[in-house]
UniProtKB/Swiss-Prot annotation:
Superkingdom of origin: Eukaryota
Listed name of the protein: Centrosomal protein of 95 kDa
Taxonomic placement: Eukaryota, Metazoa, Chordata, Craniata, Vertebrata
Compartment(s): Cytoplasm, Cytoskeleton, Microtubule organizing center, Centrosome; Cytoplasm, Cytoskeleton, Spindle pole
Chain intervals with Polar residues compositional bias: 187-199
Length: 827
């Protein structure tokens, strides 16, 4: 490890020396943000986009390094560098620093080699243009230069970490596949399935990398624009582009798929960079960016559809049971586990400057990818169902008491605000008026001691504290979910404790109220009976007009019948009727029995929740039994003493008591005889009215029971309808996601077909150009050979001289014919 670290320190110092940067490092951890920013600016000749000039903390430095990595990945390499993050480099991770140094080293070597290769090519072309004669040689030179710049314009867009196209001797399909390709999307998806081979590939790549190793000579990418502007013809020579029918398809291949690559680790700026332009767009940008004032960074924003595709396809795998935030168009920062996964998921064939050819995405990988996405969608649906199930349990707990129900209601509304569109969809139902929510306990006259309840409350608080302390040690996202669950449990326990105390007190108050209402009903009946006795004793006439007016008013106004007020309401509606005490008592008992039966039916669902209350009642009952035993023994001793005293007093007053007894017996006998006679007399008159009243009371009980059953059935139907509606919403959501995934698969297959068509077309074009060049070269070679063979023949030269002399003679005779008799030649 020490020797390898020393080698990397040497590589870093050599890079700094070659770039004329006055910095020297002694350890690998000394390569901080300033070193990589200086390397970027000196090698590429541009400013780092989104650079924070004066970083104040470690996050700003991580942001600067991340900007360097993203600029390399998007603008130059066009490959995913998610295994290198700015945060790891600022922290001093040796693996990330070595990877980034290797990228800069290979980039610098490639650019220097390209410059050195382009300079002799330029001198050769100049010499060839000087020696060539005629128009054909000039046209050939122009064609070769145009072909070079066409290749250069294509190769700018395909600058990646793989082998960037073979030479002319290799297969033409492979070269066109390297020039025009789908991008890194398919490889980014397939990198996750290659986790088992990642560590071995990284080790082999490190072993093969060394300071003296040069980049492969077959790379045809011309590098950054600053170096290209010095070496070739001017930018006007590059104005010729591929046919216009190919440019829209290339743009379609470049832009949307580039937006789907997750190249946004932490500290990445919110504004994404533009995808790599192809064709005329890149030539236009090279014409203006190659000027000396081209240091600024142009970053048009990505369309909202692309951003939404990014946010929906690349979510965190370690997501908790809560739904994501509503702003789906913003790009999420991956978690630490995802960064580690991406760092380990880059095989050797996708690393920078590797010599392996990239393979297209197969159907099996697409199928596995769609299965992963569907599995993630089912997990999200399951999380939503579990969240809604927790809410349902909170609603059942909220119906235990009045005060506690309000707390649970508020807690359910808070939870529903996170999972549902409105609180009214799944909000707690109001309790029906005919039901009591607490079990009836035996009547006690003394106050309850809350010692056991306080102990239980303390135990619950201690458990909650321990649970909270454990939750704070976990991750931040898990802590948030645990605190919310803890708050729900706290509200549940508070409601149970309040119900435990309040239920017993309410039972006592309820018994007192029922006793009071019974005592109020019975005296009313007796007073009315006495009034009726007076009216019947005076005259047996029809009821007074007041009673008629009362009946009319009661018919006009709507009736409100509670669970205890049916009998009292009927007595108020029929004040002139006489009801005997046994019948009245029997009716009251029937009503109480029906109320108790309804209470028992309502409390069957809550028996499991009142287990703690039963234990408290059992302890209190034992306490009452012990107290009763002590009191009974004390009363027994006191009774014995009183009995002895009473015997002594009875012997003195026996005669007086005997006389008073005889008098009371005689008076009682007289009163009973009178009462029996009067009752027999009145029963004959009131039997019919009593039967009518009894029948009406039974019908009222049946109406009340039927009404409660209808209300219960209505509530059950509403709940079933809400469940059905919720299930329909879940099904529609699932169908929507399935449709989206099917559309995505169709788009990918269509783009692959278009890519194959373009590759085939370019292969045909290359074959045609090669055939034309070969035919032309063969023709020129044949002419040269023919000329060489003729130059060796002396007769050929003599014939040439003869023909030239003949031509001169013809010209001379033609001139002589114009002036046939010159003066100077007559003699």
């Amino acid at each position: 490890m020490a020797s390898s670290e020393a080698e990397w320190v040497t590589i870093a110092n050599n890079l700094l020396f070659k770039c004329h940067i006055h910095l020297r490092i002694h350890e690998l951890q000394d390569c901080d943000a300033n070193v990589f920013i200086a390397l970027y600016q000196s090698i590429l000749g541009e400013k780092v986009p989104d650079l924070i000039v004066l970083p104040r903390n470690q996050e700003d430095e991580a942001h600067n390094v991340q900007a360097v990595i993203d600029s390399l990945a998007l603008d130059y390499l066009q490959v995913s560098l998610s295994h290198i993050t700015g945060e790891n480099i600022v922290k001093g991770d040796n693996e990330s620093i070595r990877n980034l140094l290797e990228i800069f080293d290979g980039l610098l070597d490639y650019l220097t080699e390209h410059i050195s290769e382009s300079s002799p090519n330029k001198s050769e072309t100049e010499q060839y243009s000087k020696d060539s004669h005629g128009e054909e040689a000039g046209e050939d030179l122009e064609r070769t230069e145009e072909a070079k710049w066409r290749n250069a314009s294509f190769m700018r867009c395909s600058f990646s970490s793989d082998t960037l196209g073979p030479t002319w001797d290799e297969d033409e399909a492979e070269s066109t596949g390297e020039i025009i390709r789908l991008g890194d999307t398919a490889h980014t998806f397939s990198q996750r399935s290659n986790g088992a081979q990642n560590s071995k590939d990284l080790r082999s790549r490190k072993a093969s990398a060394s300071p003296g190793v040069e980049p492969p000579e077959e790379m045809l990418n011309p590098g950054p624009l600053g170096f290209l502007s010095q070496n070739g013809p001017p930018c006007e020579a590059a104005s010729e582009t591929p046919p216009m029918s190919m440019v829209p398809s290339a743009r379609k291949l470049g832009e949307p798929i580039r937006a789907a690559i997750p190249l946004h680790p932490p500290y990445h700026p919110s504004e994404p960079r533009a995808p790599c332009p192809i064709g005329k767009e890149y030539l236009w940008s090279s014409r203006y960016l190659s000027t000396p004032t081209s240091g600024e960074h142009m970053a048009p924003s990505v369309e909202p559809d692309d951003a939404f595709l990014t946010s929906t396809l690349f979510k965190d795998d370690d997501q908790e049971t809560y739904l994501p935030k509503p702003e789906a168009t913003r790009t999420r920062k991956p978690s630490k586990g995802e960064r580690d996964e991406n760092r380990a998921a880059i095989p050797s064939e996708h690393l920078p400057f590797s010599q392996k050819a990239r393979k297209p995405l197969t159907e099996q990988e697409l199928h596995a990818m769609s299965e992963k996405l569907s599995q993630r969608l089912s997990e999200l649906d399951w999380m939503l169902k579990t969240a809604l199930g927790d809410r349902g349990t909170g609603e059942t707990d909220g119906n235990d008491g009045d005060g506690g129900g309000e707390e649970v209601r508020s807690g359910n509304e808070e939870m529903l605000s996170q999972h549902s569109d409105s609180v009214m969809e799944y909000g707690p139902k109001k309790p029906r008026p005919g039901f009591s929510t607490c079990r009836k306990a035996p009547y006690r006259s003394h106050s309850l001691s809350p010692s056991s309840v306080n102990k239980h409350r303390q135990l619950e608080k201690e458990k909650k504290r321990q649970h909270k302390s454990k939750g704070t040690d976990s991750c931040h996202f898990q802590a948030k979910a645990l605190t919310e669950a803890f708050e729900r449990e706290l509200r549940k326990h508070k409601v149970q404790e309040n119900v435990g105390l309040r239920g017993i007190r309410e039972e006592e108050e309820e018994e007192e109220e029922t006793g009071k209402s019974y005592r109020e009903v019975v005296p009313k009946g007796t007073s009315k009976r006495s009034q009726v006795q007076k009216t019947y004793s005076r005259k047996t006439a029809a009821p007074s007009p007041k009673g008629d007016g009362r009946l009319k008013s009661s018919k006009a106004s709507p009736m409100k019948v509670s669970e205890h007020s049916l009998l009292s309401l009927m007595l108020e509606q029929f004040p002139f009727l006489y009801v005997s005490d046994p019948t009245l008592t029997k009716m009251w008992k029937q009503q109480m029995a029906q109320v108790e039966q309804l209470k028992r039916e309502a409390q069957r669902e809550n028996r499991s929740k009142k287990k703690l209350q039963d234990e408290i009642e059992e302890a209190l009952r034992r306490h009452d039994l012990l107290t009763a035993l002590v009191k009974k023994e004390y009363d027994h001793n006191k009774r014995l003493q009183d009995f002895r005293d009473r015997i002594q007093r009875q012997r003195l007053t026996q005669s007086k008591i005997k006389e008073n007894r005889h008098q009371s017996v005689r008076a009682r006998k007289y009163y009973d005889d009178y009462r029996v006679q009067l009752r027999a007399k009145m029963m004959k008159m009131r039997t019919r009215e009593e039967m009518i009243f009894k029948k009406l009371f039974e019908e009222g009980l049946q109406i009340q029971k039927q009404r409660l059953r209808d209300l219960r059935n209505y509530a059950k139907e509403k709940r079933n309808e809400e469940k059905r509606q919720h299930q329909n919403e879940l099904d529609s959501m699932e169908n929507h996601y399935k449709d989206q995934f099917s559309l995505l698969a169709e788009a990918i297959s269509q783009e692959r077909q278009e890519l194959k068509v373009r590759q085939k077309f370019q292969a045909q074009t290359l074959h045609k150009v090669k055939r034309e060049l070969r035919a032309k070269m063969e023709k020129e070679i044949q002419q040269l050979q023919h000329m060489i063979t003729q130059n060796d023949d002396d007769a050929f030269f003599r014939e040439l001289e003869a023909e030239r002399f003949k031509a001169r003679l013809q010209l001379a005779s033609f001139q002589y014919s114009k002036n046939p008799f010159p003066r100077g030649q007559t003699s």
